[in-house]
Amino acid sequence: MQKKSATAGRAQRTEESRRRILEATLELAAEKGYEGTAIAQVAKRSGLPVGSVYWHFENKDKLFAALLQHSLDEWEGRQDWLFRSEEPPSRQLEKMISGRTFEAAEATNFWRLGLLLALERRLSGSAAREMFLEIRRSRLDLISGWWQQALPPEVTSHDPGFPLRLAQFTMAAADGLYVSTSAGEDWDATALTGMLVDSIWHLVRQAALQAGVRYDPDLTEN
């Protein structure tokens, strides 16, 4: 019994150390970026020995890859913008585009870090960059599937590639809104979200007309 209790205690301390390391890394990454963050700084910020950081994570690249996955899991746990059948597509799309923009800064630091990694071609092949790109590919598939369900079947039959293009456009709109409003300038994020959503629905209605059907995104079923 005592042996089991001791084992459970070690596991709890190990998980707590890992959490502290990841939290410290996220804080430093928000301040200094990937290149400016060092393992020694992470150890100091977390209050743990450098050896403890290396025990959990082989190197900085793998540490950042684990950070991105951990942060994504936490962020997704707070999201409810996909596949809620009681809400019309118009409301779901609005949440998809504006979700990151209206969250607290600490909740979206990993998106900022991920975008910086994606833009940094010198890091091509690194575990952290590849992790974020895989996250984006997975999210693109998820949103493409959402569009596949939201669109009338006549539209997808008429243009099978339309859901994927809409998913790419949706992600581009969300990225652009997030980057623009994160720059610290006085941009009206709410108004811009509405304009982006209206633009996308205009494209959808045009595609529906070409397919010979009518479509209303404010209805849960069409």
Roles of regions detected by a PLM:
Residues M1-K4:
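Short, intrinsically disordered or compositionally biased N-terminal tails of bacterial proteins
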Residues A6-A11:
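Short Lys/Arg-rich basic patches
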Residues T14-T25, V42, L67-W75, I143:
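Generic hydrophobic, amphipathic alpha-helix propensity
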Residues R20, A24-K62, A66:
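Helix-turn-helix
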Residues E31-E35, S85-E86, A107:
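Short coil/turn segments at alpha/beta junctions that flank glycine-rich nucleotide-binding fingerprints
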Residues D73-W81, R91-K95, E106-N109, S126-P153, ...:
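Amphipathic alpha-helical packing segments from all-alpha helical-bundle domains
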Residues L82, S98-A105, G114-L123:
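Helix-loop "lid/cap" segments that line or gate small-molecule binding pockets
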Residues E86-E87, G125-S126, R137-L166, T170, ...:
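Hydrophobic alpha-helical bundle segments that form small-molecule/ligand-binding pockets
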